[in-house]
């Protein structure tokens, strides 16, 4: 199976940090944190990793616009818009839900 082409948008690999104090506090474990906040993009690591493949496919097919859908608070939609802007593609978001402020909780 051939791996699909991807664009390089994120700064990878990101660091893996040993959380020494938490590991010590929990005892008998080593806790590590993958620092995908260090990708150098406006979006989180798992979103940009997926988009590197999707955007490469769009460009390879001659598309100039990305279209995606999600809820009004969708991190995926935000990530798609940011990545499209960075690459120079247009982006249309189809958002569902209310854009009005709904106050909940404490």
Predicted regions and their residues:
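PLP-dependent amino-acid enzyme catalytic core
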Residues: 1-106
């Amino acid at each position: 199976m051939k791996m699909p082409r991807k664009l390089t948008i994120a700064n990878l690999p990101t660091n893996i940090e040993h959380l020494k104090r938490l590991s010590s506090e929990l005892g008998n474990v080593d806790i590590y944190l993958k620092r995908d906040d260090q990708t150098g993009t406006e979006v989180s690591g798992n979103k940009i990793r997926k988009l590197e493949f999707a955007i490469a496919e769009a460009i390879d097919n001659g598309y100039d616009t990305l279209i995606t859908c999600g809820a009004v608070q969708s991190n995926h939609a935000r990530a798609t818009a940011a990545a499209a802007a960075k690459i120079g593609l247009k982006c249309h978001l189809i958002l569902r839900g209310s854009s009005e402020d709904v106050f909940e909780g404490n």
